């Protein structure tokens, strides 16, 4: 069926959510859940890339979104800092960063886990992910 690909960063830009505190992230997480349910209720597949969801958010999604599939892209925070693709880890006074001064709630029971050490291309990781998805659905 039709599929929509959304990034949490994209929604932040569209709706001008520019606060990153733990409290604001919790509120935004609930908005993301409601948005995901709205889209999937219309029989649209949704691939939603977000960072650092909470255990309560994941639980809500599993309970309330039909055919919910959680994919965890696992990597070490030191590897992320070294890659620094978004240029957020070297900003002066960069507060409210998950993994730095906000403790992440890492998934405990993801349907799929992909280990990313930044040594494989995104093309290779994508193929690995598709292969794993096909074994589930």
Language-model-derived ranges and their functions:
Residues 32-35, 61, 129, 133:
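Hydrophobic alpha-helical packing residues
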Residues 3-5, 68-72, 111-113:
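Conserved beta-strand scaffold positions in the cores of enzyme catalytic domains, especially
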Residues 12, 25, 54, 58, ...:
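Arginine residue identity/basic-tract feature
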